[in-house]
C-alpha cells in the first residue's frame, strides 16, 4: 500500500536540505510531495526572527548542521551569505514542477 505525505520546505533552511538528503533511505512506497514555502512569510506572520538572524543561534545552528551532515555522510557547506533571499530559487522550483531532481539540484547549489 502506497502512502503519500506533503513535505513543506524552503531552500533557506539547512534543516530542509539535510532532511531532503535522507529521503532516499525511506521506502519506495512513500510518495513525498514537495511543497515549497517561504519560511520568512511564516516567521513574519508570527512576528518571529529566523535562527540565522540571531547571531548566537546562527552559530549553534551551523555547528549542529555540520556535525549532523558529517555523521550522516551528507556533503554540507554554508552559503556565502545567510540568511539570503530564497524567492528566486523557490520560483524556479515551482516553474519546473518541483520535482525531486530540480529540488536536489537547487539544494546542492546552495548547500
Features from the language model and the residues they span:
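Short active-site neighborhood of thiol/selenol oxidoreductases, capturing the structured segment around
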Residues: 2-14
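Structural alpha/beta surface segment adjacent to cysteine/selenocysteine redox centers
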Residues: 15-111
Amino acid at each position: 500500500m502506497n502512502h503519500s505525505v506533503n513535505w513543506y520546505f524552503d531552500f533557506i533552511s539547512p534543516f530542509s536540505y539535510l532532511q531532503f538528503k535522507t529521503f532516499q533511505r525511506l521506502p519506495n512506497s512513500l510518495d513525498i510531495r514537495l511543497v515549497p514555502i517561504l519560511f520568512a512569510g511564516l516567521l513574519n506572520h508570527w512576528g518571529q526572527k529566523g535562527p540565522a538572524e540571531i547571531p548566537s543561534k546562527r552559530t549553534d545552528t551551523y555547528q549542529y548542521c555540520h556535525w549532523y551532515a558529517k555523521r550522516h555522510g551528507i556533503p554540507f557547506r554554508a552559503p556565502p551569505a545567510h540568511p539570503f533571499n530564497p524567492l528566486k530559487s523557490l520560483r524556479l522550483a515551482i516553474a519546473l514542477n518541483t520535482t525531486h531532481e530540480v529540488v536536489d539540484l537547487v539544494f546542492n547549489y546552495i548547500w
